[in-house]
Amino acid sequence: AARTLGFVCAPALFQRVIIDCIDEPSDVEAYARNRTALTDALAEYGYTYVEPDGAFYLWVKALEPDANAFCERAKKYELLAVPSDSFGMPGWFRLGYCVSYETIVNSLPAWKQLADEYR
């Protein structure tokens, strides 16, 4: 049988640290910058995506019906995407952008090359 490990509640150390951080403002500008760079490029390359309202990832339509096969092909370009079949969205994949801006920019040529394979 499979066993899932996780937190039932936040560890005591996290609870003590969060007391000092709870009133700090959130800086989401980096995520917005990453999202804009990624979505602008993906749209230019012919990808369809769902614009997120607050998440730090995109739902992107795979360029073939089998999202698992598409994500496997993406690995050839050192791109990491999660097929969304297990999220109830076959034919799509999840793409996180909670990385550095440089990582986003450096990935863009690979997303274009991958799209070019399907033309």
Language-model features: locations:
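PLP-dependent class I/II
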Residues: 1-119
